[in-house]
Structure formats: C-alpha cells, structure tokens
C-alpha cells in the first residue's frame, strides 16, 4: 500500500477493531527532506499528514509513508510491535478484498463504530 501511495480502506471488522479511519498514507518525502535530517523529517512527514487528515496519533497508531513502509507506535514497545502485525494483516486482507471484488465499498460507519466502541469505547465490553 505504501508503494502504491494509497491509504488502506476499512473493509472489515479486524480493521475497525483497531481504528475508525482508513490507515493513512503520507505522501513521499520531498528531495530537501530526504537530503536533510532524513529520520527527523520522516517524523514530521507523519505528524503533518495525520494533522492534514484530521487524525491524532492517539486515534490511529499506524501510518504508511509513500514509497517507504508502515510506521507504528503504542503505549509501549509490545503494543507497537502488535500494531505492526495488525497493519500488515489489514493490508493483506484489503488487497485480497479488492482482488475478489474490485467494486467493494468501505464498511458502513455504524458497523465501524460498533466494532471500535465495543473494544475501546467508554462502555467497552469486548476484547480478544
């Protein structure tokens, strides 16, 4: 997905269990950022794109950077590693979904909200 410069749409409940948004894909870095302090600028590329999408790093703990790879984080190293596995699995499922049904539409907002809130909402009750 990062190499295609596309965000990962929400097609299924596994994705919605982790976030209510498509996994964003920040644009490729400009030449001046690549030539500068590359790692530092990558962080700004991520934060700037989340802001442009109206998202917070607390809402979405994963992002793609165009022509690069996924970046993940969490409350600790274990959560960041877990999120890395999640984004890889979500990416595979989304690709297979599009191959099986090129006209597929993202999930309904009501189902996205239900799956996210039951695990992360104020009255959460479900966790695997």
Regions found by a protein language model. Give the residues of each.
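Glycine-rich flexible loops
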Residues: 1-128
């Amino acid at each position: 997905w990062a190499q295609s410069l596309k965000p990962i749409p929400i097609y299924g409940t596994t994705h919605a269990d982790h976030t209510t948004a498509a996994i964003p894909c920040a644009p490729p870095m400009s030449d001046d950022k690549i030539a500068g302090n590359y790692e530092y600028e990558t962080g700004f590329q991520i934060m700037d794109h989340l802001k442009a999408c109206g998202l917070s790093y607390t809402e979405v703990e994963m992002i793609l950077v165009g022509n690069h790879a996924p970046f993940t984080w969490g409350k600790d190293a274990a959560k960041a590693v877990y999120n890395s596995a999640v984004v890889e699995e979500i990416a595979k499922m989304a690709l297979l979904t599009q191959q099986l049904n090129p006209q597929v539409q993202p999930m309904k907002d009501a189902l996205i909200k239900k799956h996210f809130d039951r695990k992360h909402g104020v009255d959460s009750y479900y966790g695997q």
